[in-house]
């Protein structure tokens, strides 16, 4: 049994629910057992609704489902942690929700970095711990496999309390879902079970299901889960990532190329996918805008080789226009984050979905062809881009 409820916010726990942050015991808290059954079918919320994050590139091109599961793919240093912290911040401000972050078999240094950065960006409020927005549960690489295998369940139990008892929207982060499978494989070997494909445990599907099926929307509230997925040797057909994909509703892929260009969040607009991007779910307007953005960016990608060697002058007039708009779109997909204010010096922006769609609807047909592309870089909505353009002209 582990402590649950408001008293867990701002604290760090191990797999047994013991605080490990040297801030003393958790005060008068309720406890829940970590082994619980998934909600019954009758309790599930079957309505498909979008979970607005306030991050333009995510909401427009690969929207998250309320109570869905999202896979987060990206190497080291492309902004996974910052994206996770921005989501924690936005769910607290826009949805009045809370977050639980489970560190499953990752480096202790990364857990420490996340803790320090959450304190720096005020996601964990050191002065008044009760105002914190996240509870952290860690079972890192140095722990025995049993702890790493169960820490995901500890985190989801804490999230379930906020959903079922407090009736709130909860974000559950799991970093890294692959390590959960890896720990299960180690335990399976220790128990002397016959391994299945690629040496994984024979119970791989059941184990993954027992964790994933608990992460869902009920009529009371929702748990939306964002899971970092490590792909061993970049092989997507490996049983561990392949089993994970079966449960995901959306994928957010972070690109090193975009990070190198200075476009943050470095979410790849063409590689990120979502089952929610259907006209009967998001509406025709959103769907058409998203497809238009993707087509423009895809054409720009195809023209890159020509631009790299003979140069822009060799392109047709139409293609040159496409390139100019694609570069505007690429920059408009960036935005300043609240949690990165400390580093960038520019205030964070939360952009609602209708504002996001409106902005891209103006760029696509060429209404803003007269704006310099720099004006749409690191701004919130399209009005700010116009204001920035005016400021650039006045200054220039």
UniProtKB/Swiss-Prot annotation:
InterPro entries, sorted: AAA+_ATPase, ATP-synt_VA_C, ATP_synth_F1_bsu, ATPase_a/bsu_AS, ATPase_alpha/beta_chains, ATPase_F1/V1/A1_a/bsu_nucl-bd, ATPase_F1/V1_b/a_C, P-loop_NTPase
Catalytic activity: ATP + H2O + 4 H(+)(in) = ADP + phosphate + 5 H(+)(out)
Species assigned in the record: Adiantum raddianum
Protein name: ATP synthase subunit beta, chloroplastic
Keywords tagged on the record: ATP synthesis, ATP-binding, CF(1), Chloroplast, Hydrogen ion transport, Ion transport, Membrane, Nucleotide-binding, Plastid, Thylakoid, Translocase, Transport
Assembly and interaction partners: F-type ATPases have 2 components, CF(1) - the catalytic core - and CF(0) - the membrane proton channel. CF(1) has five subunits: alpha(3), beta(3), gamma(1), delta(1), epsilon(1). CF(0) has four main subunits: a(1), b(1), b'(1) and c(9-12).
Binding site for ATP: 74-81
Topology of this chain in the membrane: Peripheral membrane protein
Pfam family membership, one: ATP-synt_VA_C
Job of this protein: Produces ATP from ADP in the presence of a proton gradient across the membrane. The catalytic sites are hosted primarily by the beta subunits.
One term of GO molecular function: ATP binding
Compartment annotation: Plastid, Chloroplast thylakoid membrane
Principal location listed in the UniProt entry: plastid
PROSITE patterns membership: ATPASE_ALPHA_BETA
EC number of this enzyme: 7.1.2.2
Gene Ontology CC: chloroplast thylakoid membrane; mitochondrion; proton-transporting ATP synthase complex
CDD domains according to UniProt: ATP-synt_F1_beta_C, F1-ATPase_beta_CD
GO biological process: proton motive force-driven mitochondrial ATP synthesis
Source domain of life: Eukaryota
Family of this protein: Belongs to the ATPase alpha/beta chains family.
């Amino acid at each position: 049994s582990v402590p649950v409820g408001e008293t867990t916010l701002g604290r760090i726990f191990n797999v047994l629910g013991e605080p490990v942050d040297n801030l003393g015991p958790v005060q008068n808290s309720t406890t829940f057992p970590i082994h619980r059954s998934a909600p019954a079918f009758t309790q599930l919320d079957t309505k498909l609704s979008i979970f607005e994050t306030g991050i333009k590139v995510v909401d427009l091109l690969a929207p998250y489902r309320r109570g869905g599961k999202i896979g987060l793919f990206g190497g080291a240093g492309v902004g996974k942690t910052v994206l996770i912290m921005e989501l924690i911040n936005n769910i607290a401000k826009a949805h009045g929700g809370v977050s639980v972050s489970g560190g499953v078999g990752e480096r202790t240094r990364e857990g420490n970095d996340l803790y320090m950065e959450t304190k720096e960006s005020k996601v964990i409020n050191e002065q008044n711990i009760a105002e914190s927005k996240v509870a952290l549960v860690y079972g890192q690489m140095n722990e025995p496999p049993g702890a790493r295998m169960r820490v995901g369940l500890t985190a989801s139990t804490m999230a379930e309390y906020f959903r079922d008892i407090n009736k709130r929207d909860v974000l559950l982060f799991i970093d890294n879902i692959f390590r959960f499978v890896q720990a299960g494989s180690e335990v399976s070997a220790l128990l002397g079970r016959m391994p299945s494909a690629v040496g994984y445990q024979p119970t791989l599907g059941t184990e993954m299901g027992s964790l994933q099926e608990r992460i869902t929307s009920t009529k009371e509230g929702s748990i939306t889960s964002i899971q970092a997925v490590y792909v061993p040797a970049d092989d997507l057909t490996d049983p561990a990532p392949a089993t994970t994909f079966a449960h995901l509703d959306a994928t957010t892929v972070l690109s090193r190329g975009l990070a190198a260009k200075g476009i943050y969040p470095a979410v790849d607009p063409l590689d990120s996918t979502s089952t929610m991007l259907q006209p009967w779910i998001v509406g025709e307007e959103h769907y058409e805008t998203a497809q238009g953005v993707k087509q423009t960016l895809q054409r720009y990608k195809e023209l890159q080789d020509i631009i790299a060697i003979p140069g822009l002058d060799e392109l047709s007039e139409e293609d040159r226009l496409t390139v100019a708009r694609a570069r505007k779109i690429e920059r408009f997909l960036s935005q300043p984050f609240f949690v990165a204010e400390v580093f960038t010096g520019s205030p964070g922006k939360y952009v609602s979905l209708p504002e996001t769609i409106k902005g891209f609807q103006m760029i696509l047909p060429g209404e803003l062809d007269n704006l310099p592309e720099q004006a749409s870089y690191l701004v919130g909505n399209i009005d700010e881009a116009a204001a920035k353009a005016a400021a650039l002209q006045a200054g220039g």
